[in-house]
């Protein structure tokens, strides 16, 4: 059985090809995809006709409320591509190539008010909680560690923290709500004033409201994270930016832990920053603020989780962490 998981992330498109216990992972920068065919790149690693199922994520994923075959999905599964985050165009090209190819594929939804497994209070509070790759990451953590109850914090360009309770996604905080990531973060009073004054759009504010605003350093969506981390020990702004990120993520995790029984309080960290051990040990630093056992989900967890979702769908699973699957 060969499945493919595709993670449409901020800085690139990551692919996991899973052939039973073997995995092949490759990543393409979103800017690279403007000149390349995604399927041609995929075919360098696997014959397309051997693929049994692809699981795909795209943008906010707020236009669908189930995992659906790609041919049943309208408008790529989104209400609008406007909103939170920079638009580069690589993900759109990947999605359209796969749909036009006729390859068997399913589209994973994001977490939003239409997802019925979410607690009604979270659905009342927030229109959107997470983009689809966070579902894939949560599923990989669920399968790898075997936990039915845990808090997942995915820390990278942005930070999204989810609560999984009794094997279902219960709630969480989107990138624009609580903790900052390296690029994205919540909009504060100063930014609201700048938006109202017409100096910046809300989306532009969100896209640079993370650690980048404290570091006062921006090298584009693909290189800023590395630049800030590499300057942690020799630039005071970069040090403060990362320390502030650690504090904000810890506060977000701690706000969800009380919703779990004390003996079920576990934290899983994911993402390029959440799993970073050198030159800064991020999991160790977060543990200083969090009274729970911390586990680290290494690797390209969004793509791997997608491949696992596709595999389990082929095996007959029709519920992924509480999200319904429609597949024949």
UniProtKB/Swiss-Prot annotation:
Entry superkingdom: Archaea
UniProt-listed InterPro entries: ATPase_NBD, Methan_mark_12
SUPFAM superfamilies found in the cross-reference section: Actin-like ATPase domain
Family as reported in the entry's similarity comment: Belongs to the UPF0285 family.
Protein name as it appears in the record: UPF0285 protein MJ1370
Originating organism: Methanocaldococcus jannaschii (strain ATCC 43067 / DSM 2661 / JAL-1 / JCM 10045 / NBRC 100440) (Methanococcus jannaschii)
């Amino acid at each position: 059985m060969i499945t493919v998981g595709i993670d449409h992330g901020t800085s690139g498109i990551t692919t996991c090809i899973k052939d039973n216990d073997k995995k092949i992972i490759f990543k393409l920068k979103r800017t690279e995809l403007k000149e390349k065919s995604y399927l041609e790149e995929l075919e360098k690693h696997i014959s397309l006709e051997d693929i049994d199922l692809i699981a795909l994520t795209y943008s906010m994923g707020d236009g669908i409320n189930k995992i659906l075959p790609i041919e049943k999905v309208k408008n790529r599964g989104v209400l609008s591509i406007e909103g939170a985050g920079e638009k580069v165009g690589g993900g759109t090209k990947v999605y359209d190539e796969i749909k036009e190819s006729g390859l068997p594929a399913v589209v994973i939804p994001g977490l939003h008010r239409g997802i019925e497994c979410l607690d009604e209070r979270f659905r009342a509070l927030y229109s959107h909680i997470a983009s689809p790759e966070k579902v894939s990451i949560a599923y990989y953590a669920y399968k790898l560690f075997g936990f039915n109850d845990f808090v997942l914090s995915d820390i990278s360009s942005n930070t999204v923290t989810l609560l999984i309770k009794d094997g279902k996604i219960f709630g969480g905080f989107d990138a624009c709500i609580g903790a900052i990531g390296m690029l994205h973060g919540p909009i504060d009073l100063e930014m609201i004033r700048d938006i109202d004054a017409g100096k910046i759009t809300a989306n532009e504010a969100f896209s640079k409201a993370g650690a980048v605003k404290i570091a006062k350093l921006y090298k584009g969506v693909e290189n800023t994270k590395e630049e800030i981390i590499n300057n942690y020990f020799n630039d005071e702004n970069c040090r403060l930016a990362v320390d502030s990120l650690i504090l904000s993520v810890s506060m977000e995790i701690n706000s969800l832990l009380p919703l779990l029984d004390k003996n079920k309080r576990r934290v899983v960290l994911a993402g390029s920053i959440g799993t970073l051990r050198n030159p800064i040990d991020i999991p160790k630093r977060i543990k200083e603020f969090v009274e729970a056992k911390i586990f680290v989900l290494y690797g390209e967890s969004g793509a791997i989780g997608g491949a696992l979702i596709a595999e389990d769908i082929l095996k007959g699973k029709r519920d992924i962490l509480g999200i319904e699957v429609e597949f024949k």
